[in-house]
Amino acid sequence: MTTQLEQAWELAKQRFAAVGIDVEEALRQLDRLPVSMHCWQGDDVAGFENREGSLTGGIQSTGNYPGKARNATELRADLEQALRLIPGPKRLNLHAIYLESDTPVARDQIKPEHFKNWVEWAKANRLGLDFNPTCFSHPLSADGFTLSHPDAKIRQFWIDHCKASRRVSAYFGEQLGTPSVMNIWIPDGMKDITVDRLAPRQRLLEALDEVISEKFDPAHHIDAVESKLFGIGAESYTVGSNEFYMGYATSRQTALCLDAGHFHPTEVISDKISAAMLYVPRLLLHVSRPVRWDSDHVVLLDDETQAIASEIVRHNLFDRVHIGLDFFDASINRVAAWVIGTRNMKKALLRALLEPTDQLRQLEASGDYTVRLALLEEQKSLPWQAVWEMYCQRHDTPTGSQWLDSVRTYEKEILSKRS
């Protein structure tokens, strides 16, 4: 440890102690908050099912930065490189299309055995795994409908895919000793004016009930459902709207997924957390950065990321909120994208843990909004960076921007050699 870092740490401890914050306790609490990294940043949501297939479902990955992963071995190597540069507990979030098999596997036939390499890798890297059925980029989703499809046979295919995915998810939890959160998102919707908005939602309701009919130990598997305002090609009507899934999660007591990019640009999910927690047992968060639409830019340490972290910490939702990331930027180094976004999420959590929340809550309750605002602003200037650097040091990860040296070396020696 450098003398400069030690001096900054000691000064930071004193500054935060003056406002009633124990920085050691803040770091202990930060180690209770894993962030689930999403595998699909590493290959632009391509997966291993059909490397020649196109990305569909109203989502889009833009850019053509060289070096994207072409197979599971490369993707895991890239993830390991990123993991080494991010302090604290982490998880990995997989989509069904990241299965491994020597022969083609239909999506309704996926099994735990197709993900055994991921489980062994997760064990070696001390990671939990989360999961998602992939209800897009498939011939049977080409017309824009999956679980709400009017054709019963096609609808059943997607029901069976989701049921098979739940078994994979439960396998993850059983093998790794930590529950896998499996999130269901479907692209179902219509481009233009829709006459019958009810029938697809009725079909979706019945399909979801069939999907979750098999019971699993919640210590191994947790169901989550995710809404969206619109997607490309589904601008006018989305079957799985916010109201639909809020009602579903409340009535079925599943987890509800809130994606930062899945609402109107003037809405923020930080404001939805406390409302939803009154009705659902758990929340899954997809922290992202929408730029004018659900563009899935890399997460910044911006006001909304900070507000999301603050809501989790202020209301002590550590055991009820699962933090995941969801962005995919193909215009920059993909390993760097993981590192930037995940470190920013963890920085936001640390800053929230360093807030004198009890004092601020008392001021609010007494109606002293002037001092509340003043202290919230003064809090931003306290030396949280020194606490962050100590956290990085204790987890043997680079401080500051030093991690870039490792990424540049990896790009030169590994990524640049991929065609």
From Swiss-Prot:
TM region(s), chain numbering: none
Function: Catalyzes the interconversion of L-rhamnose and L-rhamnulose.
NCBIfam families: PRK01076.1, rhaA
EC number from the UniProt entry: 5.3.1.14
Protein name per its UniProtKB record: L-rhamnose isomerase
Compartment(s) of residence: Cytoplasm
InterPro entries listed in its UniProt record: L-rhamnose_isomerase, Rhamnose_isomerase, Xyl_isomerase-like_sf
HAMAP family: RhaA
Record's cofactor remark: Binds 1 Mn(2+) ion per subunit.
Source organism superkingdom: Bacteria
GO biological process terms on file: L-lyxose metabolic process; rhamnose catabolic process
Pfam families in UniProt: RhaA
Primary localization: cytoplasm
SUPFAM superfamilies per the UniProt record, alphabetical: Xylose isomerase-like
Family: Belongs to the rhamnose isomerase family.
Subunit structure comment from the entry: Homotetramer.
Molecular function terms, GO-annotated: L-rhamnose isomerase activity; manganese ion binding
Residues annotated for Mn(2+) binding in this entry: H262, D294, D296
Catalytic class of the enzyme: isomerase
Cofactor(s) demanded: Mn(2+)
Catalytic activities: L-rhamnopyranose = L-rhamnulose
Keywords in alphabetical order: Cytoplasm, Isomerase, Manganese, Metal-binding, Rhamnose metabolism
Listed GO CC annotations: cytoplasm
Pathway it works in: Carbohydrate degradation; L-rhamnose degradation; glycerone phosphate from L-rhamnose: step 1/3
Name of the gene this protein is made from: rhaA
